[in-house]
A protein has these predicted regions:
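N-terminal regulatory modules in eukaryotic regulatory proteins
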Residues: 133, 163-177
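Contiguous mid-protein beta-loop-alpha structural module that forms a pocket-lining wall or clamp
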Residues: 139-164
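Short, well-ordered beta-strand core segments
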Residues: 72, 107, 130, 150-151
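Short, glycine/polar-rich helix-capping loops at beta-to-alpha or helix-loop-helix junctions
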Residues: 58-62, 135-143
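Short, acidic/turn-prone active-site loops that include or flank metal/cofactor-
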Residues: 76-81, 134-138, 155-159
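Short, surface-exposed amphipathic charged segments that create phosphate/polyanion-binding patches used
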Residues: 86-93, 145-146, 164-170
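Active-site histidine-anchored catalytic micro-motif
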Residues: 100, 105-111, 115-134
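Domain-level signal for Mg2+-assisted phosphodiester chemistry and nucleotide/NA-binding surfaces
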Residues: 1-99, 119-124, 129
Length: 177
């Protein structure tokens, strides 16, 4: 997409449980939304942030997500239909925004779930740029292929570890005043 960063308006939609489980399975400490936001802000402005989950089950993350100004969409955990209602709600909200807010030209789907591939296709059909964010080992190849761009959380973790190591090398603390 040839849009300059000052003209990029992004809407973020986070399937929180999916990404939190992916981070856990990859043996990272815990999902850090700040890493994702720092990378995305290099691309443009973020005008909408929504995160979907049964927040009763993920209470420990609520304050961090609130601090990052996410609207937390409460999706009670009911497994009667077999279909994740967080996924459905996320799709409905993303399409609603696509059709009603023309200034939003970039959609970010934070999930590794292949169920979002039809959403990505529909957004692209409507001339929206789509960025996916997910954990490498728990992200569908189909989702990766459908997005215009995909950011692996694993790369963000490695980058922050490299930055921390460089900082530590410049300012060693072993016994020096």
């Amino acid at each position: 997409m040839a849009t300059s960063p000052e003209h990029i308006s992004m809407a973020l939609f986070c399937d929180f449980e999916n990404v939190a489980l992916g981070v856990r399975d990859a043996n990272y400490d815990k999902f850090d939304i700040k890493r994702v936001l720092e990378r995305l802000l290099l691309k443009g402005s973020i005008v909408v942030k929504k995160s979907y989950c049964d927040w009763e089950r993920y209470k420990g993350f609520k304050s961090t997500m609130h601090e990052a100004n996410f609207e937390l969409i409460e999706i009670p955990h009911v497994r009667q239909s077999g279909k994740n209602s967080a996924d459905i709600r996320l799709v409905v909200d993303a399409l609603d925004l696509c059709y009603t807010k023309s200034h939003v030209n970039t959609f970010v789907i934070i999930s590794g779930d292949s169920d979002f591939s039809p959403l990505v296709s529909k957004l692209r059909e409507n001339a929206k740029h789509v960025i996916g964010v997910g954990v490498k080992n728990s992200t569908s190849d189909l989702l990766i292929a459908n997005c215009d761009e995909f950011i692996f959380y694993d790369d963000l973790v490695r980058e922050s570890e490299r930055v921390a190591a460089r900082r530590e090398a410049r300012n060693p603390r072993d016994g020096q005043p």
